[in-house]
Regions:
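Structural/interface elements that position substrates and couple domains in central-metabolism enzymes
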Residues: 1-248
């Protein structure tokens, strides 16, 4: 398949390299020419074990192409992933400026064929509906598209392995056609397929992040109590984690 990632940050570059390694033609769109040149030279910009090797292998095979030009990538792409940052504002809300700006730019360059626009970024519930509205208003009249949410679940330090061997693949969309295309793209990968509504996929990502943060906070509290009482934190966490309802 021919796919595009808009954004070459942590999620974008790792996922793009993995899908290229699976035999797809992958475009990566970025805003900064200097970073594009580094990526083209085999420098992944970020450090992640195994990433540079995968990047260089697919540059050599000409399966991954970096560009600043939407018109080079978007018209021929079957699936377009949004992978730009959504940093928090001062009030804690996600800043969706980049997401909506990218959606508008994508819409202007859509080809005549059918495309799936899928959000990889962590976004609040309802964002994908807004993305759909933006694209609908700005696309060429003959462009056909659907929107889907396909959240990532990567860990720093094991992101490449997590992408090659996911626990699950979550696809949220109202469109059966979009779901089938995303399932086709992910077919070489293991993991359970979870097909849900658009909003459910958005909440799955936020809920997963929240549970992981809660577990870390609780483990820190247990560690503090162990220091005060002379208990061994690893023994305690192992003892608690063996409960199948909880996990380590």
């Amino acid at each position: 398949m021919t796919i595009t990632f808009v954004g070459h940050g942590y999620v974008g570059i790792v996922t793009a390299c993995v899908f290229a390694d699976l035999g797809n033609t992958v475009y990566v769109i970025g805003r900064t020419p200097e970073k594009i040149k580094k990526l083209e030279s085999g420098d992944p910009i970020i450090f992640e074990p195994g990433l540079q090797e995968v990047l260089k292998r697919n540059l050599l095979a000409k399966r991954i192409i970096f560009t600043t030009d939407y018109n080079v990538a978007i018209p021929s792409s079957e699936i377009i992933f949004l992978a730009v940052g959504t940093p928090p504002k001062e009030n804690g809300e996600a800043d969706l400026t980049s997401i909506f700006s990218v959606a508008k730019e994508i819409s202007k360059h859509l080809g005549k064929h059918y495309s799936v626009i899928s959000c990889k970024s962590t976004v609040p519930v309802g964002t994908n509906r807004k993305i759909k509205d933006i694209i609908e208003k700005n696309k060429p009249k003959n462009a056909l598209f659907d929107v889907a949410s396909c959240p990532e679940f990567l860990r720093e330090g094991t992101a490449v392995n997590d992408t090659f061997f996911p626990d699950r693949v979550v696809v949220g969309s109202d469109s059966k056609r979009a779901i089938q295309m995303l399932l086709k793209l992910h077919k070489p990968l293991p993991g359970e397929r979870i097909i849900v509504r658009l909003e459910s996929a958005e909440i799955i990502k936020y809920a997963s992040n929240s549970i992981l943060s809660t577990k870390i906070s609780f483990a820190n509290l247990v560690s503090f109590l162990c220091e005060k009482t002379g208990a061994d934190v690893e023994e305690v966490l192992d003892g608690v984690g063996l409960d199948k309802r909880i996990g380590r």
